[in-house]
């Protein structure tokens, strides 16, 4: 009985639970912040964090750390409830269009295959018969072949073959019927080459290209030939023909240049030598010695480093003693987007993490030297690169640790100055 109970709830109360607080619309791709469990549309919360550069929840202002996008999680349960209670209309409208677009090509394919299979067995089945039936069959074959050859001739005329004769003309039909009658009385195992030798008066060589597409269709219907192989060979031959044409054209251009130079072969040779010398000079001037660094490239790399992110590691000093020692923070690897921020920003961050009264209680050192709080981070990175070994190369593999390539900043409690 308990499972059959139904409770009625007002629509306004359900909509309030499934509304994004940023766009005031129903949730789309519900995304929840793992720290405070507030839910938003995925597009809304991503744009809010990236464009406004906030590091806290827009509703409760809880701190999300340096990488707030990593605290976002997709809420599939809430999204499924929203889809069941308030379904989207776009899916219902697009469904019939997809079905109609897919169903059309299958029908065309079935028609084309059936037409091939039905038209092929008539010729082979009626080849050995005699009498009136053979005459009627030959007439039907002549009509069918005439219509078929009309189609092939029309296709060839579209591609520019103006010399092809249509097989539906009265002269070709008469010749075709005469050949059919002679072949019906002859031996059926006789080859096509012997028939050509007997019928010397008729120019069969001029009409062989009309029967090639018909024979190909018959072979495809019987399953003896693969249509893809023929198409592949044709395309391969076309590509080879175009390559040979381009080579011949280049050779003709070279010959014309040599002829234009008053017929002297030495002038063309000197011209080619001058060209090679010019290219060698250009290469030597542009590339130069590989050991000398290029100044414009170094300046551009330095500018990119100044505009990019700054990675560094914060490590507590090991020389601290007593109650004045500062503990190690959990997230020691940090990234700052703006390299123009001074070092005092890091001191403020440590003050918040370690619950100190002021930022002056923290002292930051790099490579054993104290760092001025007003120094900018990109300048500090340049100093760190200069103090490290310049000419030593460190081999690194993909996927290995990058601890050796990250700037290390050591923090400790600043000791009060002794006044003498």
UniProtKB/Swiss-Prot annotation:
Residues 113-123, 166-194, 232-242, 260-273 have a biased composition (Polar residues). Signal peptide: none annotated. GO terms for molecular function: ubiquitin-protein transferase activity; zinc ion binding. Residues 244-253, 274-284 have a biased composition (Basic residues). Keywords: Metal-binding, Transferase, Ubl conjugation, Ubl conjugation pathway, Zinc, Zinc-finger. Interacts with DREB2A. This is E3 ubiquitin protein ligase DRIP2. It comes from Arabidopsis thaliana. The gene is DRIP2.
């Amino acid at each position: 009985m308990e499972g059959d109970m139904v409770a009625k709830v007002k629509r306004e109360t359900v909509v309030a639970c499934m509304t994004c607080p940023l766009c005031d619309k129903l949730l789309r791709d519900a995304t929840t912040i793992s720290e405070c469990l507030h839910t938003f549309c995925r597009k809304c919360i991503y744009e809010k964090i990236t464009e406004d550069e906030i590091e806290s929840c827009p509703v409760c202002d809880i701190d999300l750390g340096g990488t707030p996008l990593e605290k976002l999680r997709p809420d599939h349960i809430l999204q499924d409830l929203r889809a069941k209670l308030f379904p989207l209309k776009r899916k219902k409208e697009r469904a019939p269009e997809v079905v109609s677009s897919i169903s059309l090509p299958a029908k065309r394919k079935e028609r084309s295959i059936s037409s091939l299979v039905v038209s092929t067995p008539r010729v082979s089945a009626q080849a050995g018969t005699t009498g009136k039936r053979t005459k009627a069959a030959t007439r039907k074959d002549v009509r069918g072949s005439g219509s078929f050859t009309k189609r092939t001739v029309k296709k060839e005329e579209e591609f520019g073959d103006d010399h092809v004769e249509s097989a539906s003309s009265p002269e070709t039909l008469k010749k075709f019927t005469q050949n059919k009658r002679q072949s019906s009385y002859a031996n059926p195992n006789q080859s096509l080459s012997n028939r050509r030798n007997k019928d010397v008066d008729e120019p069969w060589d001029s009409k062989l290209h009309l029967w090639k597409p018909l024979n190909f269709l018959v072979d495809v219907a019987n399953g003896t030939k693969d249509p893809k192989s023929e198409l592949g060979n044709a395309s391969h031959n076309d590509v080879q023909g175009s390559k040979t044409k381009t080579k011949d054209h280049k050779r003709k251009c070279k010959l014309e240049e040599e002829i234009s130079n008053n017929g002297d072969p030495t002038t063309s040779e000197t011209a080619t030598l001058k060209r090679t010398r010019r290219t060698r000079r250009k290469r030597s001037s542009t590339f130069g010695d590989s050991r000398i660094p290029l100044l414009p490239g170094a300046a551009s790399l330095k500018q990119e480093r100044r505009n990019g992110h700054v990675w560094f590691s914060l490590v507590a000093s090991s020389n601290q003693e007593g109650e004045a020692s500062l503990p190690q923070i959990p997230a020691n690897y940090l990234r700052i987007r703006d390299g123009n921020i001074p070092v005092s920003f890091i001191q403020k961050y440590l003050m918040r993490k370690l619950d100190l009264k002021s930022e002056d209680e923290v002292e930051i050192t790099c490579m054993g030297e104290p760092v001025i709080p007003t120094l900018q981070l990109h300048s500090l990175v340049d100093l760190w690169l200069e103090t490290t070994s310049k000419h030593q190369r460190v081999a690194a593999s993909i996927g290995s640790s990058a601890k050796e390539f990250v700037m290390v900043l050591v923090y400790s409690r600043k000791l009060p100055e002794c006044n003498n």
